[in-house]
């Protein structure tokens, strides 16, 4: 059955092959996802000794930077889906890295960086900087600058 289906489909293969080639080579979404995974691996390797993921480190940083943001503000700033944000926030709260006024409440209104969270950022800083340099060196300084500009432009654009 498989061979018969393959033979039957082979007549249209050139069209689908061109389509698949176009998408796999030119799709910005595919390329950005791949870039994200590669760069994330660089950071994850450096942050591993600190028992924190890049997503968690980033979340801690943004919480500290925004000074007691609401989960909605965090989600908007990071462009992260609600379930991922909630999962990581709960983990950071359980680990004592993030403070929430009342963790027994159904809904968390505001979160803040705890003293342990500040120490975690400080202890991981040298390795974060090493990851930052490694990623920047791989991409090149010009690409890195252009990427920052592109993200800022897209972030400010209406959706």
Over which residues does each language-model region extend?
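C-terminal regulatory/oligomerization modules of transcriptional regulators
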Residues: 1-21, 126, 141-159
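A ubiquitous short alpha-helical element
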Residues: 27-30, 116-117
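Charged, amphipathic alpha-helical coiled-coil/dimerization segments
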Residues: 6, 90-149
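N-terminal helix-turn-helix DNA-binding core of bacterial DNA-binding proteins
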Residues: 20-23, 30-33, 37-84, 95, ...
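Alpha-helical linker/hinge and terminal dimerization helices associated
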Residues: 35, 39-42, 78, 120, ...
